[in-house]
């Protein structure tokens, strides 16, 4: 063994150390012994073991550096993930780059990404012929172009190489998969790997499985799984995790569970796959159970796990578990990572804890458009559209440029506030930014104008759209329905079908609601029956609720009840629609039956008790009304007060039941009393029905 080889082992160990002290001591020993200047091999190890700043200082002191020393300096920067600094070293290296130099620099270009620098390096590789002869350079070129979203460059680099090996072929498959070109990835794998007799590696198969998952290609995914079993690749945990993710992605939860239970080794990725898969399949209880088992097994969650569990808590909703997960995110140091923080803000918003959401949002050092959109949407969901608009204004002045998805959230907030002038301003902004050309933005605009009472503008936006998808058609149908123009809504539905646009679940909600508001019973029945028979759309609770409302308004209570009893999955909202119809048609006997069913489904909803109380009051059943009020008091239930708003001279005036905060309340009250006297005087055609006026208990 040469005299410097033990020193090499020590330097390699120092490179793996978290502090530069050991490397500095060895450096001093090499200087004293004279080994440093006599062996570039040892010098390269010193460079690799030092922090990048010290390594650069040492490199600059070398009179005539070699490619090996230059590569050691580059490797130190790449290991530290200092991609930009690695590229800035190019003019300071003072050597002609070899194949290894180009591979390191191309990796830095891929990770930034820096396509222009990558192309310049490609030209250098062509001049030195390494692009055609060195497999590592060719693979680095393919990887760089793929990361820079330039698969044409990857294809050219691959085709230029004389004899591509398995590494280069794997780079192509991975590049296609990472660029969401799953079909091309599977085709390349079939033609250039399997078709030419190459044995795919586990790395190749991970990309193939991921491509099959993107396409939800059950046949190819299962074929890969069988190949893994036949070739004893089940030892590769990364590969098995990819198969697990594939089964979850295609909705084969039972197959994923069987694979999971048969795994002898499980890491954090394995558990995260299960949690994420359960969330995506809507099985929130299983997701939270899997997470708890993971913690019990001593597996430390990572950022991906935290995001999935937080999403589960959002959907549950379970604020207490969400807070516990937040604490774990703080402990493992990922709380303020963009994806984690955004998921936490969304969870707090969906659990009606908007103050906690804003505290976390304000602590985020970086906020992308998704984070801002979550806050804007969250305030709207919590009934605070004015706060949504305030946040949007802050985004315009100090945040990232809003994307189209963010603007849809802003339009939804504006539609809740109902300020027409604001709607016009937002429409103008969308025209300037060019977002109006996107169909889903046009659909949100139609919905905005409809809810603000300007059906004419909604129609003009709809008619000006160059393309119309099912969402845009549904928004316009809903707009007609909101304005009581049910016949026009039905006619538009027929035009949509004639235009070869297949209606979806949302479309039927819109058209059935329109029929309900306009009393179009027969049309509503016909459309409801056509859902399954003609269009293959299975009615859900919302459709049944719309039909119950339609039949109830028409007085067909028995048929509405029959429809509900035939649907075993009817929710509380659907039964509430029938109870409201019973109240409107004074059917007390059916009201009590429906109320019993309703309160069994949701015993803590104050609004249902309020509705039942109005029925008892109308029948002058004071004992039942009193008993009903006692239940509300004993359970501590509070009904959210009704709120009305009117825009006057660009100012929104809000009136809440039971409150008198308006500065002109006395004038308004005096005018209302005059209207009441006029109505009761008999000089007008309208006669007030005192039975429908009750004091809110």
Which role does the model predict for each range below?
Residues 1-165, 171-267, 273-697:
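Terminal (and in a subset, N-terminal) low-complexity or junction segments at the ends
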